[in-house]
């Protein structure tokens, strides 16, 4: 998804013929359905323990939401492992937007995340300290609507789903001064900001802002330097 097209038959090949465009799209999908013969990159990896300048000469200039990683957030270890497996196939996975849940998936197909506060905290640790750009879905800092159906279309009020209105939790006043730093909170938003996961996110934000390598860095899992299931530098 992040590579410049290298096959001339797919470059600037769309026409006003809708059927032909669909056929071309399906052909392109089928021809790239596996990682075999696909380009790989070391842009996201350290050279030993040293940063190296990424080579973007074959990049198409876009990045993606990291759906494979998201889909494996049944626990932090699974998500981390899946991300490491996929990273060579992105031009630079440090640009991937990483997330646990969304308006569609929690990350399962049925309900908002209900793995517990401790598991949520570990998931957030991965999002804010591993490669990628962390993204939070509204309400997750409170485990909002945990366990309820994500979306059932017209078959139930939104208030009973994962897409329920969250604004009530944000009523009041607060003055934000920096990432994870605020003063003068009052009303419902004060309680929201004091929730365990909200406090954890504030702390992770401050750590990430203080360490440039966590914001946009490279990593290594070489056993020369680290040892452990989720260990990296």
Which residues are covered by each model-predicted region?
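Active-site-proximal helices and loops of the catalytic beta/alpha 8
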Residues: 1-92, 96, 115-117, 123-126, ...
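Catalytic-domain carbohydrate-binding cleft regions of carbohydrate-active enzymes
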Residues: 98-99, 133
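Active-site neighborhood of divalent metal-dependent phosphoester/pyrophosphate hydrolases
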Residues: 100-107
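Glycine-rich, aromatic-lined ligand/substrate-binding cores of catalytic
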Residues: 102, 135-138
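Alpha-helix capping/termination and helix-coil
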Residues: 107, 131-134, 208-215
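Short, solvent-exposed helix-loop connector elements
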Residues: 109-114
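Short glycine-rich loop/turn motifs that provide flexible caps or phosphate-binding loops at active sites
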Residues: 131, 138, 142
């Amino acid at each position: 998804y992040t590579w410049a097209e290298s096959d001339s038959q797919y470059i600037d090949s769309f026409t006003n013929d809708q059927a032909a465009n669909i056929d071309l799209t399906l052909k392109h999908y089928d021809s790239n359905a596996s990682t075999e013969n696909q380009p790989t990159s070391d842009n996201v990896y350290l050279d030993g323990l040293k940063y190296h300048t990424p080579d973007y000469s074959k990049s198409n200039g876009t990045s993606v939401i990291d759906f494979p990683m998201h889909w494996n957030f049944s626990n932090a270890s699974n998500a981390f492992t899946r991300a490491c497996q996929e990273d060579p196939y992105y031009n630079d996975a440090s640009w991937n937007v990483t997330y646990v849940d969304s308006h569609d998936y929690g990350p399962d197909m049925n309900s908002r995340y209900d793995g517990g506060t401790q598991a949520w905290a570990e998931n957030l640790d991965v999002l804010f300290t591993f490669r990628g750009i962390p993204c939070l879905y509204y309400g997750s800092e409170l485990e909002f609507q945990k366990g309820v159906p994500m979306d059932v279309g017209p078959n139930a009020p939104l208030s009973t789903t994962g897409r329920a209105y969250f604004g009530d939790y944000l009523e009041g006043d607060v003055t934000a001064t920096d990432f994870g730093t605020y003063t003068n909170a009052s009303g419902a938003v004060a309680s929201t900001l004091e929730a365990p996961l909200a406090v954890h996110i504030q702390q992770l934000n401050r750590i990430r802002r203080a360490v440039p390598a966590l914001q946009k860095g490279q990593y290594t899992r070489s056993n020369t330097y680290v040892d452990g299931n989720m260990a990296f530098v």
